[in-house]
Amino acid sequence: MDKLSGENITKEYPGGITALRNVSIEVKRGDIVVVMGPSGSGKTTLINILGLLDVPTKGSVYLDGREINRLNERERCEIMNSSFGFIFQFFYLIPELTVIENIMLPLWIKERSYRKIKSYYEEAEKLLEEFHLLKRKDAYPSHLSGGEMQKVAICRSLICKPDIIFADEPTGSIDRESSEMFFNFVQLLNKKRGMTFFIGTHNEKFLQFATKVVYLNDGEIEKIKE
């Protein structure tokens, strides 16, 4: 991925609710884009639309010049599985799956081939080792701390080697120590792998290393700082 962009994005919901109004934004390879704004400003909606989890009412999303929001569901899923990673505030780990099974879940959806999935098992173990969780690979989410669950969510977002990671309030439900770990993770992957991040947050500490800051209010961009 060289560039992901949204042009004139508007999102309307039944009942006359407009979550986004004519929003245009550009994300380049290696960017750390931080979207700030109060609750209800449209941060999550923007993440969902750029990440193909939702579609705009009006406007377009482009990936390297290709309009992707009008593709069929299968084509959108292929892009999501190959190019996008997601980290959510509440992690959404499957309680019936072990740590390593949760990490492998995107591969099961993407590959649908046992042989291919098996070859990725070592990759999942390497990620767990990198985050000091290898000994917990067979544990279930109910036995993990908040910080450990966040690390599992991070590993899951990386297993398909995405071009960009979307993070929605990634430090919103974890303690200070785990938040510091996430800040370090973003900076390390950005520097080491050139990983691109698009982060919606209230946490102003992200501003210290953001390459672009977008301020949203009531579904509109108030200003952009680069």
Label each PLM-derived region with a short phrase:
Residues 159-163:
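A short, proline-enriched helix->beta-strand linker immediately N-terminal to the Walker B motif
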Residues 1-6, 10-22:
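A short, flexible loop at the N-terminus of ABC-type nucleotide-binding domains that lies
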Residues 51:
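Helix-to-loop junction immediately C-terminal to a conserved catalytic motif
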